[in-house]
Amino acid sequence: MIDNHNSKKIRSIFKGNLRVSAKNLSHSTLNKIESIIKAVEKIPQQMALSLDDSSYSKEELLLLLRKTVENNPEIYGSTIAFEPYMFDADSRYFAPYYYKNDKEIKFTFIGSESYKYFLWDWYKIPKEKNQSVWSEPYFDEGAGNIIMATYSVPFYREGKDGRE
């Protein structure tokens, strides 16, 4: 004899346990993702604070960026992108960029007539809002050449017209 009542009750208990397990797993996964995001956000925030207070040479900026990418496995790459002519009065573009490629640290300068970084959302929106911003995922053709999301933090330097 088969007791349908018991099998229904067992099925109900099993479904309940599955729901609880799925809920716990989703909360655990969400906590891990949030932890990684918070760690990633701290990296450019700290860089922006140091850039606000200091006047780095080109060599010092390159070393700072390289060490940042080397020492932070959770990020793909990093740039410090200046307003046109702000870092060097003779150069429209100044955006050194270090990134990981096949477990190596690679370097390039981004910014050219074909890649005007100051027109991209990752640069433009934080500047306009004067606050840190996560970009929507995008294919970064010309710099990373991969799908990425960018966390951008504006920074300022004292210029001839005040804070720029």
Q: Which residues does each predicted region cover?
A:
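Phosphate-binding glycine-rich loops and adjacent basic patches that engage nucleotide phosphates
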Residues: I2-R11, A22-K32, F82-D90, G111-Y117, ...
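Juxtamembrane extracytoplasmic/periplasmic/luminal helical "stalk" adjacent to the first N-terminal
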Residues: M1-L63, M148
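Extracytoplasmic/periplasmic sensory segments of membrane signal-transduction proteins
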Residues: I36-Q131
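Extracytoplasmic/periplasmic ligand-binding sensor regions of membrane-associated signaling proteins
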Residues: E104-E164
